[in-house]
Swiss-Prot record:
Domain of life: Eukaryota
Single GO MF annotation: large ribosomal subunit rRNA binding
Function description: Binds to 23S rRNA.
Source lineage: Eukaryota, Viridiplantae, Streptophyta, Embryophyta, Marchantiophyta
Protein name, entry field: Large ribosomal subunit protein uL14c
GO terms of biological process kind: translation
Family assignment from sequence similarity: Belongs to the universal ribosomal protein uL14 family.
Subunit structure: Part of the 50S ribosomal subunit.
Gene3D superfamilies for this protein: Ribosomal protein L14
Organism: Aneura mirabilis (Parasitic liverwort)
GO cellular component, one term: cytosolic large ribosomal subunit
Pfam families with a match to the protein in the record: Ribosomal_L14
Subcellular location: Plastid
InterPro entries in alphabetical order: Ribosomal_uL14, Ribosomal_uL14_bac-type, Ribosomal_uL14_sf
């Protein structure tokens, strides 16, 4: 569960390292974002000499959360960290690589390009 002011890692090579959520996109009354939801975030830490700079406002899709997620088959999955992948206006990833495992729920949210870049889909 990601809400405003939540810090998360970045799971791609766009240059950002840490994000802080400032808005959960969707309807006005959404408080939390889960896996596959799009957020608006600010870059808190960035790698020098990369396109994404510190204090830049970016859109990102949630790839991993520490909050457990129940699946329809009864299994539960949870990750060690909160992580997001930065995206552009067309919902394509800004980076060319994705790091770490990605939840299968992104496939249902039409983020197939992120799924194809991921080394492992759980």
């Amino acid at each position: 569960m990601i809400q405003p002011q939540t810090h998360s890692n970045v799971a791609d090579n766009s240059g950002a390292q840490k994000l802080m959520c400032i808005r959960v996109t969707g309807t006005n009354d959404r408080e939390y974002a889960g896996i596959g939801d799009v957020i608006v975030a600010v870059v808190k830490e960035a790698v020098p000499n990369m396109p994404t700079k510190k204090s830049e406002i970016v859109r990102a899709v949630i790839a991993r959360t520490r909050k457990e997620i129940g699946r329809t088959d009864g299994s539960v999955i949870k990750f060690d960290d909160n992580a997001a992948v930065t995206i552009n206006r067309e919902n394509n990833p800004r980076g060319t690589r994705v790091f770490g495992p990605i939840a299968r729920e992104l496939r249902g949210s039409n983020f197939t390009k992120i799924i194809s870049l991921a080394p492992e889909v759980l």
